[in-house]
A protein has these predicted regions:
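Metal-cofactor-dependent catalytic cores
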Residues: 1-276
């Protein structure tokens, strides 16, 4: 088999909304530049995701020199400008972490509240915000637990071969997609180099109900697919279901689509039970 290559790079500026495909990207300690640097919360500061508000996956972002431009079904276009953000910081909750986050503006709060039909607020990972990966001296954005997620095309193909209705890679929300490797080869990788960056694969990614949300319709699959099928061959002893690998970047640098993926070192892959 020819060398493994990077085939897709995706950043998700707003947690749980649509990703933006990039031809090249700067990788920082927190992951891809701008990835999960915005989060939507309830009025108490608890984060909101597509797990409970699946319509978020239909919110489209475009990056500009001064901020973002947002579009969503039935909503007027919204321009987000960094210079208009408030100077107020408030603690927001992402899982068990409390992060001091910069409140953006009442106008943006109202836009998301109207779209979701739910009172909410919108925050940015400002210069005074700080969060670390658990157990590692490594900065983190509003991502679930790790800065980056990698999945191979072969792994998705192996899953889709078991599904009645194939799913798109977008339902798993990876930052990095690679091709020209065996299915689940990434399970055994420990350190890899892509472009200028060395990555350490620190943990398989446990999957939840969010993977059942169709990225085009914003609706959940009633049969809980593909999670139900994944459970049959990707459930570990801890009863979690895993698909994809969490990464941290060991240095900052640039990567681009077409870069070779160099496997620097390997480790024993997680074991999974298989059920009928």
């Amino acid at each position: 088999m020819s060398s493994t290559i990077l085939t897709n790079v995706t950043t998700y500026p707003i947690k749980s909304t649509q990703g933006i495909s990039l031809n090249n990207a700067l990788v920082k300690e927190t992951g891809l530049e701008l990835d999960r640097h915005f989060v939507i919360t309830d009025l108490n500061g608890k984060f909101i995701t597509g797990r409970t508000k699946s319509a978020l996956v239909l919110v489209n972002s475009n990056i500009t020199a001064t901020g973002l431009i947002l579009n969503a079904p039935g909503m007027p276009e919204l321009r987000i400008t960094y210079n208009n953000f408030s100077n107020k910081y408030q603690n927001v909750q992402v899982w068990n972490d409390e992060i001091s986050a910069q409140h953006c503006s009442n106008e943006i709060d109202q836009w998301f509240s109207m779209y979701l039909n739910f009172s909410c607020r919108f925050y940015y990972l400002g210069e005074h915000s700080h969060r670390e990966v658990k157990g590692l001296d490594h900065k983190l954005s509003f991502a679930d637990g790790y800065p980056l997620l990698l999945i191979s095309e072969a792994s998705l193909e192996a899953l889709n071969a078991k599904l009645e209705h194939p799913v798109a890679m977008a339902q798993f929300r990876p930052n990095l997609v690679v091709s020209q490797c065996l299915e689940f080869a990434e399970d055994g990788w420990h350190k890899i180099r892509i472009g200028e960056v060395v990555f350490e694969i620190v943990k398989p990614c446990s999957r939840c109900i969010f993977t059942t949300v169709n990225e085009i319709t914003g609706k959940r699959n009633k049969q809980k697919e593909p999670l139900s099928t994944l459970k049959k061959f990707r459930q570990a002893k801890d009863k979690e279901i895993y698909f994809g690998q969490n990464l941290i970047a060991l240095n900052e640098g640039s990567i681009k689509v077409g870069d070779k993926v160099e496997i620097i070192s390997k480790h024993p892959p997680q074991e999974y039970s298989v059920s009928n």
